[in-house]
Amino acid sequence: MKNKINLSYYGNDGKGCEYDIYENGEVTIYFMLNGIEISDVDVDLECLGCSTIEQLVIDLLNFGYKINL
């Protein structure tokens, strides 16, 4: 099992997005509707314009995402 950080954001309309950020720099983005996954995509940090995991986490927190423990 890979170690990961999960961050999510959901609007009042039930639409949302979740990021699984793995320690090796891989990222899976899930697009959600009313708690159900409707699509996902695998990318790396560079595709998101970040050079470190910390930078991506800070950017997402600044955009209103919440860390899921």
Please place each PLM-identified region on the residue numbering.
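Short intrinsically disordered terminal tails
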Residues: M1-N3, Y65-L69
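Acidic, low-complexity, intrinsically disordered interaction modules
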Residues: S8-G64
